[in-house]
Each structure stands twice: as structure tokens, then as C-alpha cells.
């Protein structure tokens, strides 16, 4: 409100203080810009609010699934074989269940060892506990290979 008080005396005294008035306007504009920046931020938040509605729609359509990866693996193993949507849904549920079991077991292991971080070692042990026999061995070897590839670049 101080810039408005400065402007009123400047408008009352016309003539010699016209340059001061011109200088007062940029200051007022700067103050106005500061004030405008805040509503601009709010305005920027408002489209995000609208965007959130769009994001909600996107979230509905972009639910995390493994369908694409299941399909890619299927085509690597059997290029001429297809999969029904029901079978794909079952496979996706299966992977989500296994992932949840491994994550839960790894979390328990880190708590037992009083460590705040779940490392690859906890994941490896959890895989050995959750998956049976030969499947666990293959999963551990593939996981080790993937971690090595990731860390090497």
C-alpha cells in the first residue's frame, strides 16, 4: 500500500515531478509485478489443479502394469504366439503378487538386521526365501547379471 501513497502525492504535484512520477510507476510496477508474481504462481497452480484432473485421467489410464514387458518376453521366447487379455491380466497379477512378497520379505530382513536401507543383498535373500528351488537360483543369477549391467554403465 505504500506505493499507492507515494503515487498520490506525485499526482498532486504535477509539473517538475513528472520524471519522479515516471520513476514511481516502474517502482509501483515492480511492486505490482511482485504482487502479480504471487497470483501468477497461484494461476500456475490453478492449471495444475485442472491438470490434476487430467493427471487423474492419465493416472487411471497409466496404471503401472507389466503387460508390455510380459508381451516382449513372450515374443522373445515364442515369436509366433499371442496372449489373450485375460491371460495377460493373470500374468500381471502374478508379477504384482511376487513383487509384493519379495518386497515385504526384504523389508522384514532389513528390519531384523536393524538397517534402514533395503539393499540388493536383502532382495537376493528375499528371492531365495520366496521363490522355490531352481526358480530362485535362476532369479538370483538374472538379478545379479542385471545389477552388474546397471552399475557398469
UniProtKB/Swiss-Prot annotation:
Signal peptide: none
Name of this protein: Histone H2B.3
Keyword vocabulary terms for this entry: Acetylation, Chromosome, DNA-binding, Isopeptide bond, Nucleosome core, Nucleus, Ubl conjugation
PROSITE patterns: HISTONE_H2B (PS00357)
Record SMART domains: H2B
Pfam families on file: Histone (PF00125)
Biased composition, class Basic and acidic residues, residue ranges: 1-10, 20-54
Positions bearing N6-acetyllysine: 41-42
Assembly and oligomerization: The nucleosome is a histone octamer containing two molecules each of H2A, H2B, H3 and H4 assembled in one H3-H4 heterotetramer and two H2A-H2B heterodimers. The octamer wraps approximately 147 bp of DNA.
Protein family: Belongs to the histone H2B family.
PTM section of the record: The N-terminus is blocked.
InterPro entries named among the record's database cross-references: Histone-fold, Histone_H2A/H2B/H3, Histone_H2B, HISTONE_H2B_site
